[in-house]
Amino acid sequence: MSKIGFLTDSCSDIPQELADKYGIEVVGFPINLDGVEYMERKDFTNDQFYQMMRDAQGVPTTAAITQLQFCDIYARYADEGYTDLVYLSINAGGSSTYNNAVKAMELLEEERPGYTMKIQVIDSHTYSMPYGWYFCECARKVRNGGELASCVAELKQKLDCVEICLAAYSLKQMKKSGRVSAAAAVVGDLLGIRPIISLNAGVSKVEGKVRGDAAVPAAMIKWVESRVDSMKDTPYMVAYTSNTARRDELVKLCKKAFGHAPLIVFQLGGVVSANTGPDGIAIVYEGKPRNLEAYAPELP
Protein backbone atom coordinates (compact mmCIF):
# COMPACT_ATOMS: atom_id res chain seq x y z
CA MET A 1 0.00 0.00 0.00
CA SER A 2 1.25 3.47 -0.88
CA LYS A 3 2.22 5.89 1.86
CA ILE A 4 2.62 9.37 0.36
CA GLY A 5 4.25 12.42 1.91
CA PHE A 6 3.89 16.03 0.80
CA LEU A 7 6.62 18.56 1.50
CA THR A 8 7.05 22.24 0.67
CA ASP A 9 8.81 25.33 2.00
CA SER A 10 7.52 28.32 3.90
CA CYS A 11 7.58 30.58 0.84
CA SER A 12 4.41 28.71 -0.17
CA ASP A 13 2.55 30.71 2.52
CA ILE A 14 0.19 27.80 3.16
CA PRO A 15 -1.84 28.57 6.31
CA GLN A 16 -0.98 26.06 9.01
CA GLU A 17 -4.57 24.86 9.28
CA LEU A 18 -4.53 23.83 5.61
CA ALA A 19 -1.11 22.20 5.96
CA ASP A 20 -2.40 20.18 8.91
CA LYS A 21 -5.64 19.31 7.13
CA TYR A 22 -3.93 17.85 4.07
CA GLY A 23 -0.85 16.42 5.74
CA ILE A 24 1.70 18.79 4.22
CA GLU A 25 5.01 19.42 5.96
CA VAL A 26 6.25 23.01 5.59
CA VAL A 27 9.97 23.67 6.06
CA GLY A 28 10.83 27.18 7.25
CA PHE A 29 13.28 29.50 5.53
CA PRO A 30 15.94 31.27 7.61
CA ILE A 31 15.63 35.07 7.44
CA ASN A 32 18.32 37.42 8.72
CA LEU A 33 17.37 40.89 9.88
CA ASP A 34 19.87 43.32 11.40
CA GLY A 35 22.29 40.49 12.17
CA VAL A 36 19.75 38.22 13.87
CA GLU A 37 18.65 34.99 12.20
CA TYR A 38 15.01 33.96 12.48
CA MET A 39 13.13 30.92 11.23
CA GLU A 40 9.95 31.63 9.32
CA ARG A 41 6.80 30.05 10.79
CA LYS A 42 8.62 29.53 14.09
CA ASP A 43 10.04 32.80 15.39
CA PHE A 44 7.43 35.34 14.25
CA THR A 45 3.97 35.79 12.82
CA ASN A 46 3.47 37.60 9.53
CA ASP A 47 2.23 40.74 11.27
CA GLN A 48 5.20 40.71 13.63
CA PHE A 49 7.57 40.43 10.67
CA TYR A 50 6.00 43.41 8.90
CA GLN A 51 6.63 45.53 11.99
CA MET A 52 10.15 44.15 12.33
CA MET A 53 10.86 45.33 8.77
CA ARG A 54 9.52 48.80 9.49
CA ASP A 55 11.69 49.09 12.60
CA ALA A 56 14.84 47.57 11.08
CA GLN A 57 17.91 49.51 10.03
CA GLY A 58 18.76 47.11 7.22
CA VAL A 59 16.95 44.90 4.75
CA PRO A 60 16.00 41.28 5.52
CA THR A 61 17.89 38.59 3.65
CA THR A 62 16.91 34.98 3.13
CA ALA A 63 19.05 31.87 2.86
CA ALA A 64 18.34 28.62 1.05
CA ILE A 65 17.28 25.41 2.75
CA THR A 66 20.42 23.26 2.65
CA GLN A 67 21.16 19.89 1.11
CA LEU A 68 21.81 18.47 4.56
CA GLN A 69 18.43 19.64 5.82
CA PHE A 70 16.70 17.99 2.89
CA CYS A 71 18.70 14.79 3.31
CA ASP A 72 17.66 14.58 6.97
CA ILE A 73 14.02 15.12 6.02
CA TYR A 74 14.16 12.53 3.23
CA ALA A 75 15.78 10.00 5.58
CA ARG A 76 13.03 10.52 8.15
CA TYR A 77 10.33 9.82 5.58
CA ALA A 78 12.20 6.77 4.26
CA ASP A 79 12.64 5.42 7.80
CA GLU A 80 8.92 5.90 8.45
CA GLY A 81 8.03 3.67 5.51
CA TYR A 82 6.85 6.21 2.98
CA THR A 83 6.69 4.95 -0.58
CA ASP A 84 6.50 8.41 -2.18
CA LEU A 85 7.52 11.94 -1.24
CA VAL A 86 6.60 15.00 -3.30
CA TYR A 87 8.47 18.24 -2.65
CA LEU A 88 7.19 21.42 -4.31
CA SER A 89 9.84 24.13 -4.29
CA ILE A 90 10.10 27.89 -4.39
CA ASN A 91 11.00 29.19 -7.86
CA ALA A 92 14.38 27.68 -8.76
CA GLY A 93 15.39 30.88 -10.51
CA GLY A 94 15.18 32.83 -7.27
CA SER A 95 16.67 30.38 -4.80
CA SER A 96 19.18 27.52 -4.73
CA THR A 97 16.70 25.59 -2.59
CA TYR A 98 15.38 23.59 -5.55
CA ASN A 99 18.87 22.47 -6.58
CA ASN A 100 19.70 21.60 -2.98
CA ALA A 101 16.59 19.42 -2.82
CA VAL A 102 17.65 17.59 -5.99
CA LYS A 103 21.23 17.08 -4.84
CA ALA A 104 20.04 15.84 -1.45
CA MET A 105 18.72 12.71 -3.15
CA GLU A 106 22.34 11.75 -3.86
CA LEU A 107 23.22 12.30 -0.21
CA LEU A 108 20.31 10.11 0.79
CA GLU A 109 21.71 7.26 -1.30
CA GLU A 110 24.85 7.46 0.83
CA GLU A 111 22.86 7.67 4.06
CA ARG A 112 20.28 5.03 3.14
CA PRO A 113 21.83 2.80 0.43
CA GLY A 114 19.17 1.08 -1.64
CA TYR A 115 16.27 3.15 -0.31
CA THR A 116 13.11 2.52 -2.30
CA MET A 117 11.08 5.65 -1.58
CA LYS A 118 10.35 7.62 -4.75
CA ILE A 119 11.12 11.33 -4.40
CA GLN A 120 9.72 13.93 -6.79
CA VAL A 121 11.21 17.44 -6.61
CA ILE A 122 9.11 19.96 -8.53
CA ASP A 123 10.01 23.55 -9.38
CA SER A 124 6.95 25.75 -8.89
CA HIS A 125 8.41 28.59 -11.01
CA THR A 126 6.64 31.02 -8.69
CA TYR A 127 6.26 32.26 -5.13
CA SER A 128 3.77 32.19 -2.26
CA MET A 129 0.25 30.73 -2.38
CA PRO A 130 0.25 30.51 -6.18
CA TYR A 131 2.00 27.21 -5.56
CA GLY A 132 0.82 26.67 -2.01
CA TRP A 133 -2.86 26.59 -2.96
CA TYR A 134 -2.47 24.16 -5.82
CA PHE A 135 -0.23 21.94 -3.71
CA CYS A 136 -3.02 21.79 -1.14
CA GLU A 137 -5.42 20.81 -3.92
CA CYS A 138 -3.03 18.10 -5.09
CA ALA A 139 -2.63 16.68 -1.59
CA ARG A 140 -6.38 16.87 -0.96
CA LYS A 141 -7.17 14.87 -4.09
CA VAL A 142 -4.55 12.23 -3.29
CA ARG A 143 -5.79 11.95 0.31
CA ASN A 144 -9.28 11.41 -1.10
CA GLY A 145 -8.15 8.51 -3.28
CA GLY A 146 -6.79 10.22 -6.38
CA GLU A 147 -3.89 8.70 -8.29
CA LEU A 148 -0.66 10.47 -7.40
CA ALA A 149 0.67 10.66 -10.97
CA SER A 150 -2.49 12.27 -12.37
CA CYS A 151 -2.79 14.68 -9.43
CA VAL A 152 0.84 15.78 -9.85
CA ALA A 153 0.29 16.22 -13.61
CA GLU A 154 -2.70 18.45 -12.89
CA LEU A 155 -0.61 20.40 -10.36
CA LYS A 156 2.04 21.08 -13.00
CA GLN A 157 -0.60 22.26 -15.45
CA LYS A 158 -1.96 24.73 -12.91
CA LEU A 159 1.54 26.02 -12.14
CA ASP A 160 2.10 26.47 -15.88
CA CYS A 161 -0.76 28.99 -15.97
CA VAL A 162 -0.47 30.89 -12.70
CA GLU A 163 0.47 34.59 -12.80
CA ILE A 164 0.72 37.35 -10.21
CA CYS A 165 -0.06 41.07 -10.38
CA LEU A 166 1.55 42.87 -7.44
CA ALA A 167 1.47 46.47 -6.24
CA ALA A 168 3.77 48.04 -3.66
CA TYR A 169 2.42 51.06 -1.76
CA SER A 170 5.88 52.07 -0.60
CA LEU A 171 9.22 51.94 -2.37
CA LYS A 172 11.19 52.00 0.89
CA GLN A 173 11.85 48.27 0.96
CA MET A 174 12.72 48.14 -2.73
CA LYS A 175 15.16 51.00 -2.15
CA LYS A 176 16.77 49.12 0.75
CA SER A 177 17.12 45.95 -1.30
CA GLY A 178 18.55 47.81 -4.29
CA ARG A 179 15.63 47.03 -6.62
CA VAL A 180 15.15 50.76 -7.21
CA SER A 181 17.61 53.60 -6.70
CA ALA A 182 17.43 55.73 -3.58
CA ALA A 183 16.62 58.80 -5.67
CA ALA A 184 13.85 57.05 -7.59
CA ALA A 185 12.35 55.72 -4.36
CA VAL A 186 12.33 59.14 -2.69
CA VAL A 187 10.83 60.88 -5.71
CA GLY A 188 8.36 58.05 -6.27
CA ASP A 189 7.10 58.12 -2.71
CA LEU A 190 6.88 61.93 -2.69
CA LEU A 191 4.79 61.89 -5.87
CA GLY A 192 2.74 58.91 -4.74
CA ILE A 193 3.97 56.73 -7.61
CA ARG A 194 2.89 53.10 -7.22
CA PRO A 195 4.39 50.43 -9.51
CA ILE A 196 2.19 47.67 -10.93
CA ILE A 197 4.38 44.56 -11.18
CA SER A 198 3.78 41.27 -12.97
CA LEU A 199 5.35 38.00 -11.89
CA ASN A 200 5.19 35.41 -14.64
CA ALA A 201 7.22 32.16 -14.62
CA GLY A 202 9.35 33.54 -11.81
CA VAL A 203 10.27 36.75 -13.68
CA SER A 204 9.14 40.12 -12.32
CA LYS A 205 8.50 43.16 -14.50
CA VAL A 206 7.12 46.63 -13.87
CA GLU A 207 4.11 46.82 -16.20
CA GLY A 208 3.02 50.33 -15.33
CA LYS A 209 2.89 53.06 -12.71
CA VAL A 210 -0.03 54.94 -11.24
CA ARG A 211 -0.19 58.01 -9.05
CA GLY A 212 -1.94 57.72 -5.71
CA ASP A 213 -3.08 54.78 -3.62
CA ALA A 214 -6.68 55.00 -4.82
CA ALA A 215 -5.65 54.21 -8.41
CA VAL A 216 -3.86 50.98 -7.54
CA PRO A 217 -6.68 48.36 -7.38
CA ALA A 218 -8.30 49.46 -10.66
CA ALA A 219 -4.93 49.40 -12.44
CA MET A 220 -4.25 45.90 -11.16
CA ILE A 221 -7.61 44.63 -12.33
CA LYS A 222 -7.14 46.29 -15.72
CA TRP A 223 -3.83 44.46 -16.11
CA VAL A 224 -5.40 41.11 -15.23
CA GLU A 225 -8.19 41.75 -17.75
CA SER A 226 -5.55 42.13 -20.45
CA ARG A 227 -4.09 38.72 -19.60
CA VAL A 228 -7.17 36.48 -19.60
CA ASP A 229 -9.91 35.63 -22.08
CA SER A 230 -12.80 35.73 -19.62
CA MET A 231 -12.75 37.22 -16.14
CA LYS A 232 -15.85 35.30 -15.05
CA ASP A 233 -14.19 31.99 -15.93
CA THR A 234 -10.87 32.82 -14.24
CA PRO A 235 -10.07 31.49 -10.75
CA TYR A 236 -8.16 34.01 -8.66
CA MET A 237 -6.77 34.73 -5.19
CA VAL A 238 -6.07 37.95 -3.31
CA ALA A 239 -2.92 38.52 -1.24
CA TYR A 240 -2.14 41.25 1.24
CA THR A 241 0.34 42.18 3.94
CA SER A 242 -0.63 44.43 6.83
CA ASN A 243 -3.35 46.73 5.53
CA THR A 244 -6.75 45.09 5.86
CA ALA A 245 -8.60 48.12 4.47
CA ARG A 246 -6.68 47.85 1.18
CA ARG A 247 -7.27 44.11 1.20
CA ASP A 248 -11.01 44.55 1.64
CA GLU A 249 -11.18 47.18 -1.11
CA LEU A 250 -9.30 44.95 -3.55
CA VAL A 251 -11.50 41.95 -2.72
CA LYS A 252 -14.62 44.08 -3.27
CA LEU A 253 -13.44 45.32 -6.67
CA CYS A 254 -12.25 41.86 -7.71
CA LYS A 255 -15.62 40.31 -6.88
CA LYS A 256 -17.25 42.87 -9.15
CA ALA A 257 -14.73 42.45 -11.98
CA PHE A 258 -14.50 38.65 -11.88
CA GLY A 259 -18.13 38.08 -10.96
CA HIS A 260 -17.25 35.63 -8.19
CA ALA A 261 -15.34 35.39 -4.92
CA PRO A 262 -11.62 34.56 -4.70
CA LEU A 263 -10.46 31.02 -4.02
CA ILE A 264 -8.71 32.34 -0.92
CA VAL A 265 -7.54 35.59 0.64
CA PHE A 266 -4.12 35.17 2.24
CA GLN A 267 -1.23 37.02 3.83
CA LEU A 268 2.15 37.21 2.15
CA GLY A 269 4.80 35.62 4.36
CA GLY A 270 8.29 36.67 5.33
CA VAL A 271 10.17 35.42 2.27
CA VAL A 272 8.01 37.34 -0.20
CA SER A 273 7.48 40.48 1.89
CA ALA A 274 11.24 40.63 2.55
CA ASN A 275 11.45 41.66 -1.11
CA THR A 276 8.22 43.57 -1.62
CA GLY A 277 8.04 45.29 1.75
CA PRO A 278 5.26 45.30 4.36
CA ASP A 279 2.85 47.38 2.25
CA GLY A 280 1.75 45.36 -0.74
CA ILE A 281 -1.27 43.65 -2.29
CA ALA A 282 -1.55 41.16 -5.12
CA ILE A 283 -3.96 39.33 -7.40
CA VAL A 284 -3.06 35.76 -8.31
CA TYR A 285 -4.89 34.32 -11.31
CA GLU A 286 -4.84 31.52 -13.84
CA GLY A 287 -3.56 32.89 -17.13
CA LYS A 288 -2.81 31.10 -20.37
CA PRO A 289 -0.51 28.05 -20.56
CA ARG A 290 3.14 28.90 -21.12
CA ASN A 291 4.32 25.40 -21.99
CA LEU A 292 1.91 23.51 -24.21
CA GLU A 293 4.05 20.39 -23.90
CA ALA A 294 2.80 20.11 -20.32
CA TYR A 295 -0.64 19.32 -21.75
CA ALA A 296 0.43 16.69 -24.26
CA PRO A 297 -1.00 13.23 -23.49
CA GLU A 298 1.44 10.62 -22.29
CA LEU A 299 1.76 7.84 -24.85
CA PRO A 300 2.22 4.24 -23.75
Regions found by a protein language model. Give the residues of each.
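Mixed-charge interfacial surface used for oligomerization/domain docking
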Residues: K3-G5, C11-E25, P30, G93-E106, ...
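N-terminal glycine-rich anion-binding loop in soluble enzyme alpha/beta folds
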Residues: G5-Q69
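Aromatic side chains
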Residues: Y22, Y38, F49-Y50, F70, ...
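Glycine/charged-rich beta-loop-alpha catalytic/anionic-binding loops adjacent to active sites
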Residues: M53-D55, T83-Y87, E111-I122, V265
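Glycine-rich phosphate- or other oxyanion-binding loops that anchor nucleotides, phosphorylated ligands
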Residues: D55-G58, A64-E106, L148, V152, ...
